[in-house]
Amino acid sequence: HKFSEDGWDKVMDLNVKSIFFMVQKFLDLLKKNTTPDNPARIINIGSIDGINTPYYENYSYSVAKSAVHKLTSVLAAKLIKDNIICNAIAPGPFPSKMLGSAVEHDYSIISKKNPSGRVGMPEDIAGLAIFLASRAGQYTVGETITCDGGLVASAGHDLTND
């Protein structure tokens, strides 16, 4: 496959630059009224494709999501002194337009190959985000947490071949 430079830039801009410049824009607001006992939170969305080498040739997406994970740790290291906690969630397979187009919206093969036996549900991400935004997640700083049904913890995540 050939990938266009414009396409690459669009994916990087959407996934990496947008996070950095949004944090920069809202930094004063994030700092306002925070304390060590009540910090502000930033929760970025990465992907397991930024952790493992994906099956599909989604070069820019994988690189961008890996950059999101690194940006998360860099921001966390710099912002914790201002009582701002930064973490990331790295989802695995969830029903979406992007994944759906790759599997013709038939998630059954992915479910069979996932150690959990299913694809993700909105509640899976919501629960993790609630934890990270709550007092219970307040001591978790700079982490990228997978939400993938065990794919990264297992041998890999090639969900397409039998």
In which residue ranges do the predicted regions lie?
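Substrate-binding pocket helix/loop in short-chain dehydrogenase/reductase
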Residues: 1-9, 99, 110
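Active-site helix of classical SDR
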Residues: 23, 64
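Active-site loop-to-helix junction immediately N-terminal to the catalytic Tyr of the SDR YXXXK motif
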Residues: 3, 53-62, 74, 102
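C-terminal substrate-recognition "lid" of short-chain dehydrogenase/reductases
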Residues: 118-147, 152
